[in-house]
A protein has these predicted regions:
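Multi-pass alpha-helical transmembrane bundle typical of ion/small-solute transporters
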Residues: 1-334
Length: 334
C-alpha cells in the first residue's frame, strides 16, 4: 500500500468519489422516475423530489453488503492505492458524463466496476482481480435485466387476469395511486444498491491509508454523505434519459408502470441483500421491455433496446481502458 496520503489529497479523492455518487444520481435518476413520469402520474419536477427522498432513506432498510463487495470483492484490497481509486473514478466519471450528454442509459455501476478492474490490472496485473466477486458481478449484468423482465411480465399477466372484468378507466385510476408505492419501492432499491458502491470505494480508500484499523468496515459518516450525494444528484436528474426509458422503449399506462417498477424493485431488493452490485439501469430496462412484450412483441421498440444493450456491452471495456490509461498517466507523472 502507498505511504499515508496527505490529508488535503485524501479529502480531494473523497470529494471525487462523492462527485461520482452525485453523477450516479444524476445519470440514474431516470431509472427511479421514468415510468411514473411517462404515465403522467407525476410531473418530472415533483417526481425527482419523490425519488430523492426515498434514495436518501434507503440505508435504513438495507445492510452494507454491496459496499463490502465493492470494497474487497472486485479487486484485492491490498492492491488498492489512492492512484487506483482516482483512476477508477476517472474512468467511471468520464463515461457517465459522455453517456448522460448523449442521453444513453448506460450503467454507472458497471462503469465503476470496469474502472476498478482497469486500474487494478494496470497496477498489479490480472492477479489483482478477485475472480469470484467479479464473476458474480458480471453474471448479474445478464441476470438482473432478465429477472426484471420475467417478474414484470408475470406481474402484468397476473394483474390483467385479476382485473379482467374492470373497465380500463377503473384500472387506470387504481394503478395511478399504486404507482406511488411502486415508484417508492424502486427508489429505495436504487438508493440501497447504488449509494453503497461509492461507500465501498471511500471505505477501501480509508482502509488503504490505515484509517480503519485492521478490519474493513464502512463508517456511518461515509454512509450518510454517500446517500446525500446520490439524493442530491437525483434532484438534478436529466430529462433526456427519462424520455428514453419512459417512452422510447415502449408506451406505458399506470398499470404497466406499476408492474415494471415492482418487478425492478424486487430484483434490486434481492441483489442488495445478497451483496451483488447490479445495474439499476439494466434492471428497469429489462422490466419495461417485459411489460411491453406482455402486451405484444411489436410493442417494444427493439431498435432502441438494441442500442441500449450495445452501450451496456461497451461500458465495462471502455471504462477499464480509460481507468488503465489514467493510472499509467498518473504513474508516469508521479
Amino acid at each position: 500500500m502507498d505511504a499515508a496520503l496527505a490529508f488535503p489529497l485524501l479529502v480531494s479523492l473523497i470529494a471525487v468519489a462523492l462527485f461520482f455518487d452525485f453523477l450516479n444520481g444524476l445519470h440514474d435518476a431516470a431509472n427511479s422516475i421514468a415510468t411514473i413520469v411517462s404515465t403522467r402520474v407525476l410531473r418530472p419536477q415533483y417526481a425527482v423530489f419523490w425519488a430523492a427522498f426515498f434514495n436518501f432513506i434507503a440505508f435504513l432498510f438495507f445492510g452494507l453488503h454491496v459496499a463490502n463487495t465493492l470494497g474487497t470483492g472486485i479487486i484485492d484490497a491490498d492492491t488498492i492505492t489512492p492512484a487506483v481509486i482516482f483512476a477508477a473514478l476517472a474512468g467511471a466519471i468520464v463515461w457517465n458524463i459522455v453517456t448522460w450528454l448523449a442521453g444513453i442509459p448506460s450503467s454507472s455501476s458497471h462503469a465503476l466496476i470496469g474502472g476498478l478492474v482497469g486500474a487494478g490490472v494496470a497496477k498489479a496485473g490480472f492477479g489483482a482481480i478477485v475472480w469470484s466477486g467479479l464473476g458474480k458481478t458480471v453474471a448479474a449484468i445478464v441476470l438482473s435485466p432478465l429477472t426484471g423482465f420475467f417478474l414484470a411480465l408475470l406481474l402484468v399477466l397476473a394483474v390483467s387476469w385479476v382485473f379482467v372484468r374492470q373497465t380500463p378507466f377503473a384500472v387506470d385510476r387504481s394503478f395511478r395511486i399504486l404507482q406511488f408505492l411502486s415508484a417508492s419501492l424502486y427508489s429505495l432499491g436504487h438508493g440501497g444498491n447504488d449509494a453503497q458502491k461509492t461507500m465501498g470505494i471511500i471505505a477501501v480508500l480509508l482502509y488503504s491509508q490505515g484509517m480503519l484499523g485492521d478490519t474493513f468496515y464502512v463508517p456511518l459518516w461515509v454512509v450518510l454523505t454517500c446517500q446525500s450525494a446520490l439524493a442530491l444528484g437525483t434532484l438534478f436528474g436529466g430529462w433526456r434519459i427519462v424520455h428514453t426509458m419512459g417512452s422510447k422503449i415502449t408506451r406505458l399506462n399506470p398499470m404497466q408502470g406499476f408492474c415494471a417498477e415492482t418487478g425492478g424493485a424486487l430484483t434490486l431488493f434481492g441483489a442488495t441483500w445478497l451483496g451483488i452490485p447490479v445495474s439499476t439501469t439494466h434492471t428497469i430496462t429489462g422490466a419495461i421491455i417485459g411489460v411491453g412484450a406482455a402486451r405484444r412483441v411489436s410493442a417494444v421498440r427493439w431498435g432502441v433496446a438494441k442500442s441500449i444493450v450495445v452501450a451496456w456491452v461497451v461500458t465495462l471495456p471502455a471504462t477499464a481502458a480509460i481507468a488503465a490509461a489514467t493510472y499509467w498517466l498518473t504513474h508516469l507523472a508521479g
